[in-house]
Every structure is written in structure tokens, then in C-alpha cells.
Amino acid sequence: MELKTIEFIKEHEENWRELLKDIPYCLTINENDNYAIFKYSQTGSDFNEQICKECRGLIIDKNILKPIALSFYKFFNYGEQFADKIYWKDCKVQEKVDGSKMLVWYDAYENKWQISTSSQLNAYEAKVQDFNITFGQLFDKALINNNLTNNDFYNLLDKKFCYTFELVSPESRVVIPYKQADLYFIGVRNIETFEECNTLDFMDICNKIKTPKQYPLNNLKACLHATECMGYDEEGFVVVDSRFNRVKIKSPAYVSAHHLKNNSTVNQSRILNIIENGEQEEFLTYFPEYKEYFVTIEDKLVEYKNNLKLAIEDINFKMEHNDPCLPWTRKDFAKYINQTYPQYSSMLFKYMNMDLINLFIDNQWSKLSKEDKMKKLGLKYEQEEE
């Protein structure tokens, strides 16, 4: 079956570039003399359109209008509108590697293997942000770290297939820190049939390059529970079934870390949430670059709580020493609080309205077992029938 993208180009030979760059597709297109690579926009592309799902680094030969390379179609987090339906009886739950997708494919015009990113045909021209290095150079470093030369690596490959790898490195870090440049073998596609293949059928590569860890999980509930137990050094899972349907299941900790920066601005509310959950020590183990932000916000939190405590002590003192000859009314206390402690007024009003002794008693009583409650009341405890 022909790709929708190819069909569209054939139907709009004169202006396919302009149309595909415009809504509803909003594709980025990069070209050289023979090839074009297509990448969707995460925010602009309409994923109701199959074309947008296909264009996740799709490479076509412009001369013959044939797809030359593609890793996976766009896939989504479970629960999202466009997420694939997974056949759980026959699926694999794999580690979600937190890296950059790299596509390796054979160039028949140049008679050599090429390495592309998801948006650039030549990975050696794709600069890593904030570093004087390209993704192609990082790929080479990763091969060296796996004791492979480029020739050794290319000798493992078959021209009838295109191959997908996940590249991780300190320089190209997304969220999770990796100590050195490395590769994970994550996908293969037959370019003659354009059907996806099982990576485990390519053991020559699997024996030389890492593959994602696999987990003995076979349902959504088990996967969700497992992600809740993950730390900040794991992204989550990719679930792929025998039909190559895929969904992502990300850990809450990873999502929190990933969204810690919004448009290069640190999200202070997320830092506060991590502090309140008591997870700052674990978080800073993996992301020490955020320490000064945590110190600042934690100091502000401690200061706020200490000042609130002093305000409560002041109100308690005034309530206990209220002059019986000229007593303060609730209105007088409200006026004093609003004038003296405007930042804490809502909490102080709630405090004054609380019956703290009974609140404490009720809280502790609710924690007792039925047997303990009966004993404390001097009553006989009888086991209830199920």
C-alpha cells in the first residue's frame, strides 16, 4: 500500500511543498538534490491526517517518488486521542530510551550508508544545541564506545533495510543524564515492502549494539503501577504489539522533570511540588544543575511556615489574654489580622475557626483498627462474618 504522503505529492506535483508546509500538515521539509525528509510539527500538525503520522523523519527519493527510509509512524502516550489500540495478548513492554532518533539508510546515488536525524538528511550537518558538535559526530563516538569502527558497523547492515537507533549522550541530553555517547537498536524496516521488522531477527546488530530492556508486563494496569515506582532516571515504557502498534507510557517522575522548564524558563511550581513530595534529594541526584532553584524555593517555604507559626502564636496570645473588661470581638481580630498579617489572613481565619483538640482526637481515632476501638471503649470485639 502506497504512503499517503507519496499519493499527495503525485496528486500535487506543482505545489506539494507549499501545501505540505501549510495547515493542516505544517510539515518541515529539508532537501538535497535527490532526497527530501519530512517532519511533523508537534504543536501545528493535525494528527487526524495520516500524512502527519507518516512524516516522522520520512525520507523519499524525489526522482522516483519512492520512500527510502522511515523509522516508526508517529505514536502517542496511552490515553491520548490518537493512541494506537494495543493487542495486549501479544506485545512487548520495552524500556523507553530518552534520546534522539537516528535513521541509517543506504544512498544508492552516492553508494554509501547515510545517517539522518528526524529532520535533517545529513546528521553530520545537524548541530547539537549549545555544543560544538553534530549528531553525526556523536553517532561516531557512540560506535567507538561500542568498540566499532564505522566500517565494522556498516558491515552489519543490509541495503534492503533502513535501521533506527536511539542516540544518547551528555551533549544531546533530553532529560535523563547519560554518562557517555551510546546507541540503542530500536527499529528496522524493509524498504522494498516498507513493512516493519522485528529487531530480534537481526542478531548480528543486537550482539554489537544495545537494545532496550524488556519487562514481563502484559497489561496497562501493571505498566502504570510500574511507572509510578520509577525514579527520575527512567522515562517509562514503549509497548509494541505483534502488529507494530505502539504507545508510550511515561513515568510521572519523568514527566515532572521534563516539564520543569517551559520555554527555557524554570517552572517554579513544579519544583515546589517536588519539595512537598519529599523527592528533592532524589531529583537533584540526577539533575544537580537545578540545585540553586531548589535552595531558593525551599528557603522561601521555610520562611513562610516560620512566619505563619509566629503569627499563630501572636493570635493565640491575644486570644488568651483578651481583656474581659474591653474584649476584642471577632471583627476586631479580623481587622488586626488583615492589617498585621495580610499574607496569612486566610489561614489565620481558618485557624481561629478550628476546634483543634477535637480535630486531633478525630484524626487519631480514625487511624485505629476496629479491634482497638472496641478495646478502648471497654467493649467486646466480635469478628464480623465475611
PLM features per residue range, with description:
Residues 1-386:
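Core nucleotide-handling region used for phosphoryl-transfer chemistry
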